[in-house]
Amino acid sequence: GMLIAATDSQAVTLEWALSCVLNHPEVFKRARDELETHVGQDRLLEDSDLSKLPYLKNIIYETLRLYTPAPLLLPHSSSEECIIGGFKVPRDTIVLINAWSIHRDPKVWSEATSFKPERFEKEGELDKLIAFGLGRRACPGGGLAMRALCLSLGLLIQCFEWKRVGDKEIDMREESGFTLSRLIPLKAMCKARPVINRLEK
């Protein structure tokens, strides 16, 4: 069950990430330039390249911030009476964390609703991201999910030219539910780049 849930949330996040970079051509170009510099067009991106691609990783972080796949993190139970945000919470109370709201809070993030992957170049910004939870109860698959997402998005950027369908920006409205899916599924046009042709030979 856990693996299926992880696969679903990764697919949802990848769709959001591609939507974001297609709406922000300057972000797409910077990610492509980073890939060209460190990987090139003679071979495919590999897992071992990811440590040299901080901007690609920041795109995923920023996507997870704005479009957390599970907007309400897994429920927790208070082990003892405590105060949360000024509210008295009795022992054994189910507590939900609204990551979606925290990730868009202007008191926590500058330009909170803007897609800006470069924000994670600043010291301490990553510590505020709670897409995988925090501490001992954080998602055990967070590291694996990050690698899979970076590799997938990186390969899509490396191997294909991408264009939006028409001139209008991609609709970024969300569908409410257990996972934060797009209201309108992403439609985009792609064309293979030379690296694909080289691999076929």
What kind of region is each of these model predictions?
Residues I4, L45-P54, I83-F87, E121, ...:
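Conserved, non-catalytic sequence blocks in retroelement Pol enzymes and Pol-derived host proteins
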Residues S9-V27, R32-E34, G142-C159:
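Cytochrome P450 catalytic-core helices
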Residues P25, L44-G86, P106, T113:
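Conserved cytochrome P450 K-helix E-x-x-R motif and the immediately C-terminal K′/meander segment
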Residues A31, T63, V89-D92, F115, ...:
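Hydrophobic, well-ordered secondary-structure elements that form the walls
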Residues E36-H38, G124, F132, R136-A138, ...:
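Cytochrome P450 proximal C-terminal region
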Residues T37-Q41, R65, P69-L73, E121, ...:
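Conserved helix-loop functional segments at active or binding sites
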Residues Y67, S79, I97-E123:
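Conserved cytochrome P450 K-helix/beta-meander segment immediately N-terminal to the heme-binding cysteine loop
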Residues G85, D92, I97-N98, K191:
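Generic beta-strand/beta-sheet core signal
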